[in-house]
Design a protein with these regions (language model features):
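Extended, solvent-exposed functional surface patches
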Residues: 1-167, 173-184, 188-189, 264-265, ...
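Long, domain-scale non-catalytic interaction/scaffolding regions in large secretory-pathway
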Residues: 1-20, 160-166, 171-525
């Protein structure tokens, strides 16, 4: 039996009991079969609030995997999910441009990063659930676009070589080779030559790779070892080098505790972990213990229902589900769970699914688990309670946000009249160039946007999406320096109001971001 102290879940940043803790709700999640956590994570991304390329492709991935699991386990296949999937495919098609590239949001330029990410999800989905006819044409167009981009890169590399300069494939070229190795299609002769050129360069890059690059290169080289037997040996060397950097802690599992990487459009901790797992499954499939230790860290990085971004959730699902179909319906005797000494009842279907999720109102101080099986198990405890929004302070990490609200007809800031317009000005300062940045301005409840239509606004260079309680701004590129974003609102009722925060963050690398404090707005007749 193992005991866990839960008291720290109810403390504030000063180490004292947080306000609202007495009215908390405690959720306990536990499974003898971590593969089921992947299935449980899928609904959270299967019906997204946003209609950008990543959210839509993640949803297509989630709904297709759900259908695949239902068929595998002879469960009911829901018609509603199939209709939702068809709609999401149609919406994603509208974000693909004539050249095959994908735009992040409608109206934006096509992006190599975005196209690579969408195509990678497509080939991984095909690897788990079989070739998908609904996305096949989109994938072909995306690969054509990426092939053209890569051909340009190869041409430039050869020019540099003629000048006796050292050249290496870019990270995007590495992703391209991965997509081709997963897809398996035969390319035109000139594109096959580009591929062979890049593979040869990649096999000789030993000192120039990041941990992620080595793990991804190991997978690519192993998949291409039929055309060159030496590639498999080199793949093994890369994987061995990667494993020398691993850190192991019993609770956390096996992971890579390297210094924070230079900025990239997405956080690479989870992709690195997934690539190492993928390389291990290909090159050392019998080393089950190491693979399970790597998967344990992936589970520990899970945030309540899902990982921190849809694309990381998709990555994690792939790492657990690829080749693990036989484990989906593996049964094991349930563990005995006690909260503050009281036995927690188990739902009837928990034995079948190997998964338990239960809630209990109020604070809790101790969780006890008596495990009855030898399988890897995983659990989590979440505490939810409300705190005054005024206690949330500002913060910044690479991106700074300042917000100013100016009533058009009042003399003093912070006061407004019913029926007048106010202007909210956001001043965003970036310490470097950032990709795919989302700004969310949670406004006071008395404000209604003058322009309530979503769309790309060329004047400020971003996609604007007004919602019921907040306005979202999406920049596919936020350059270094200061940026001004302005929105006008009508004041529609009197009273004293408190806004929410305004946040700016890299959507797929959320450790880079900033947040403002809240503001008060007094509205007179």
């Amino acid at each position: 039996e193992q005991n866990f102290d839960l008291s720290k879940l109810f403390l504030n940043k000063e180490g004292k009991q947080a306000k609202g803790a007495e009215e908390a709700k405690v959720t306990i999640e536990y499974t003898n079969n971590p593969s089921w956590l992947m299935v449980k994570a899928l609904p959270a991304i299967s019906n997204p609030d946003e209609e950008d390329a990543i959210s839509l492709m993640s949803a297509i991935y989630a709904n297709t995997i759900t259908n695949h699991v239902q068929k595998h386990l002879s469960l009911e296949n829901l018609t509603q999910e199939s209709i939702r999937l068809q709609n999401q495919v149609e919406k994603l098609k509208k974000l693909q441009n004539p050249d095959g590239s994908f735009s992040w949001w409608k109206g934006m330029k096509g992006s190599r990063y975005m196209t690579t990410s969408v195509a990678e999800m497509m080939v991984r989905l095909n690897a788990i659930a079989g070739v998908q006819k609904s996305t096949a044409r989109m994938l072909t167009s995306a690969i054509d676009y990426l092939s053209w981009q890569t051909a340009q890169e190869v041409r430039e590399m050869k020019k540099q070589e003629e000048k006796k300069q050292k050249v290496n494939p870019s990270e995007q070229a590495l992703h391209y080779l991965y997509i081709l190795s997963m897809d398996g299609r035969k390319m035109k002769q000139n594109l096959e030559a580009d591929k062979a050129y890049l593979l040869e360069k990649m096999s000789k890059m030993t000192g120039d790779f990041s941990i992620y690059g080595k793990a991804r290169a190991a997978v690519v080289l192993a998949r291409n070892s039929q055309q060159n037997a030496a590639y498999r040996e080199k793949a093994g060397e890369y994987l061995q080098s990667v494993n020398e950097y691993a850190v192991y802690r019993e609770e956390m599992g096996r992971y890579y505790d390297t210094r924070k990487a230079l900025y990239s459009w997405r956080n690479y901790k989870i992709p690195t972990q997934v690539s190492v797992i993928e390389a291990m499954q290909m090159l050392k499939p019998n080393d089950k213990q190491t693979i399970e230790e790597l998967q344990r860290w992936l589970l520990m990085s899970k945030r309540t229902q899902v990982w921190d971004t849809p694309v990381n959730t998709v990555d994690a699902v792939y790492a657990f589900m690829k080749g693990n179909e036989s484990n989906w319906n593996r049964k094991a005797e349930n563990a005995v769970l006690k909260l503050d000494g009281k036995l927690l009842p188990m739902p009837q279907d928990s034995t079948t699914l190997g998964y338990v999720k239960t809630e209990r109102p109020g604070k809790a101080s101790k969780l006890s688990i008596d495990k009855k099986s030898d399988y890897t198990s995983w659990g989590a405890v979440y505490a939810e309670f409300k705190q005054p929004i005024s206690e949330i302070g500002s913060m910044e990490s690479g991106i700074k946000v300042r917000r100013v609200i100016v009533p058009a007809e009042s003399e003093s800031k912070g006061n407004a009249q019913v029926g007048e317009k106010v202007k909210v000005t956001l001043i965003i300062t970036a310490d470097r160039d950032y990709d795919f940045v989302q700004i969310t301005d949670k406004r006071a409840a008395c404000l209604e946007p003058v322009n309530q239509l979503s769309g790309y606004q060329w004047s400020i260079g971003c996609y604007v999406s007004p919602r019921d309680h907040a306005t979202n701004f999406y920049f596919d590129r936020l350059s270094k320096g200061k940026h001004i974003v302005e929105m006008e609102y009508y004041v529609d009722r009197k009273g004293d109001y408190q806004s929410g925060t305004c946040t700016a963050e890299c959507t797929y690398s959320p450790e880079f971001g900033g947040r403002t404090e809240t503001y008060e707005l007094k509205v007179n007749n």
